[in-house]
Amino acid sequence: MDVQMKRGLLDVCVLAAIKNEDSYGYKIIKDMKPYVELSESTLYTILKRLETANMLTVRTAEHGGRLRKYYRITEEGNKRIEDFKAEWREILSIYRFVIKEDSDND
C-alpha cells in the first residue's frame, strides 16, 4: 500500500478511536487492535501530527499517581473523518465499476 495512503488511513483510524470519548495511548492501541496493529512509537508520531494539525487536543491528568495524556478530537478532526467517508464512498463507487468490468470479462 502507498505510504501516503496508509498514513492517511491510520490518521483517520486514530481520530475514530477518540471520536466518542477522550482517550490515552494504551487504550487507543487496544481499541484499534481488532482492526489494525499499531506500535506505540507509530501511535505517538500520529498523535503528534494530529495535534499539530489541530485535529485533536491534549490534556494531562493524574491517574493512579502518574500523569497520563488524554486526547480529544476537535471540530477539525471530526471534519477530517467526514471528508474521509466522502472520499471512500467515491472510491467504493469506482471499485464497484472496476469489479463489474472484471466480472463482465469472465
Regions found by a protein language model. Give the residues of each.
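Amphipathic alpha-helical dimerization/coiled-coil segments
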Residues: E82-D106
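Short, motif-level signal for alpha-helix interfacial/capping segments enriched in acidic residues
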Residues: A17, T52-A53
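Short, hydrophobic-biased segments on the C-terminal half of alpha helices
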Residues: L47-R49
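Beta-hairpin "wing" of winged helix-turn-helix
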Residues: A53-L67, R72
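N-terminal helix-turn-helix DNA-binding core of bacterial DNA-binding proteins
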Residues: D2-T42
